[in-house]
């Protein structure tokens, strides 16, 4: 550990300033010793504060307002974001740790890259003094005095610049940006259309004054072709209903009565094609045919699990009906 520096070596000729000691856990004993010595020698008009550098870098706390003097009791190299967080025109004292002469060159280069100015002479061989760069001032634009305006001289503002009009870009580039057809597709994208895209949509007129629009029906002696369109639409609807009934009729765990459903031999649970159109639901609840258990109070199979038509039902004494 280097020899301790007397606190009077860090006195500021410009007046009292807040002294902040930034330390780390790697150099905790040196940090505590310097903080104690500065507090014992500080005049009543100045204050000495201590803070861990990680709290400053993590924005857990902020630096005191200027005027400010910062003591860095940190291992080398210094954290990359520390130098940029130091306020302008702030004097810093870097307390060099022992056996770190090989890293002094990189330290001076880092300080010079951030425009820190060295302060000579240094308080001690183990302490470096630097001053952070001052805040940049706003540039002032000097303007020549303009003559008094007259009736023949146009009035212009001092320091005004001529208005720069934006020139039109390449017209071919703009046209390609908004083009509908792509040169990458030879047919202009027509091959990407599906049969559903090519189908002409139905013309449905919206309701007026809240009254629904009635659909025009074909006459008995229709000759305009509307009757054929209605028949084709009804055929498509009927085919869709029959297709939807297939999935229902092919279920083998329903309980439709036997007089409405007769399975073919060897294909139990499969309805014959001629019986599918004749089958209708007769249940009041509509759940028994969907494979649900018998739950209606008037059902003779109340409490039994669903079974297939034609299956022999055996109820044991232990069953709770």
From Swiss-Prot:
It is found in: Cytoplasm; Mitochondrion intermembrane space. Residues 285-299 are annotated as: Fe-S binding site B. Residues 1-161 are annotated as: N-terminal SAM-like domain. GO terms for molecular function: 2 iron, 2 sulfur cluster binding; 4 iron, 4 sulfur cluster binding; electron transfer activity; metal ion binding. GO terms for cellular component: mitochondrial intermembrane space. Residues 139-156 have a biased composition (Low complexity). The keyword Lipid biosynthesis does not apply. Residues 162-197 are annotated as: Linker. Residues 123-168 are annotated as: Disordered. InterPro entries: Anamorsin (IPR007785), CIAPIN1 (IPR046408). A motif (Cx2C motif 2) lies at residues 296-299. GO terms for biological process: iron-sulfur cluster assembly. Its main location: cytoplasm. [4Fe-4S] cluster binds at residues 285, 288, 296, 299. [2Fe-2S] cluster binds at residues 203, 219, 222, 224. It comes from the Eukaryota. Pfam families: CIAPIN1. Component of the cytosolic iron-sulfur (Fe-S) protein assembly (CIA) machinery required for the maturation of extramitochondrial Fe-S proteins. Part of an electron transfer chain functioning in an early step of cytosolic Fe-S biogenesis, facilitating the de novo assembly of a [4Fe-4S] cluster on the scaffold complex CFD1-NBP35. Electrons are transferred to DRE2 from NADPH via the FAD- and FMN-containing protein TAH18. Belongs to the anamorsin family. Monomer. Interacts with TAH18. Interacts with MIA40. The C-terminal domain binds 2 Fe-S clusters but is otherwise mostly in an intrinsically disordered conformation. The N-terminal domain has structural similarity with S-adenosyl-L-methionine-dependent methyltransferases, but does not bind S-adenosyl-L-methionine. It is required for correct assembly of the 2 Fe-S clusters. This is Fe-S cluster assembly protein DRE2. The gene is DRE2.
């Amino acid at each position: 550990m280097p020899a301790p520096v007397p606190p009077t070596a860090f006195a500021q000729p410009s007046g009292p300033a807040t002294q902040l000691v930034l330390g780390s856990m790697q150099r905790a004993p040196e940090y505590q010793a310097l903080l104690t010595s500065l507090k014992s020698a500080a005049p009543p008009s100045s204050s000495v504060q201590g803070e861990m550098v990680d709290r400053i870098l993590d924005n857990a706390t902020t630096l005191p307002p200027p005027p400010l003097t910062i003591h860095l009791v940190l291992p080398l190299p210094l954290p990359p974001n520390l130098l940029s967080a130091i306020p302008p025109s702030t004097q810093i004292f870097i307390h060099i740790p022992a056996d770190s002469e090989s890293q002094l060159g990189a330290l001076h280069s880092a300080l010079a890259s951030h425009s820190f100015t060295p302060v000579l002479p240094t308080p001690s061989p183990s302490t470096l003094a630097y001053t952070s760069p001052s805040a940049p001032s706003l540039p002032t634009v000097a303007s020549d005095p303009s003559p008094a305006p007259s009736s023949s001289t146009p009035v212009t503002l001092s320091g005004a610049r001529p208005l720069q009009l934006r020139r039109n870009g390449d017209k071919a580039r703009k046209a390609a940006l908004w083009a509908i057809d792509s040169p990458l597709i030879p047919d202009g994208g027509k091959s990407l259309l599906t049969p559903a895209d090519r189908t002409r949509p139905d013309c449905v007129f919206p309701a007026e004054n809240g009254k629904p629009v009635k659909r025009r029906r074909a006459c008995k002696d229709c000759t305009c072709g509307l009757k054929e369109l209605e028949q084709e639409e009804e055929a498509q609807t009927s085919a869709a209903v029959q297709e939807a009934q297939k999935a229902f009729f092919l279920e083998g765990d329903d309980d439709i009565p036997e007089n409405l459903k007769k399975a073919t031999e060897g294909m139990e649970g499969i309805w014959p094609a001629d019986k599918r159109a004749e089958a209708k639901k007769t249940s009041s609840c509509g759940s028994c045919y969907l494979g649900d258990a018998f739950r209606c109070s008037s059902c003779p199979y109340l409490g039994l699990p669903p079974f297939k038509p034609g299956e022999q039902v055996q109820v044991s004494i232990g069953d709770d009906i």
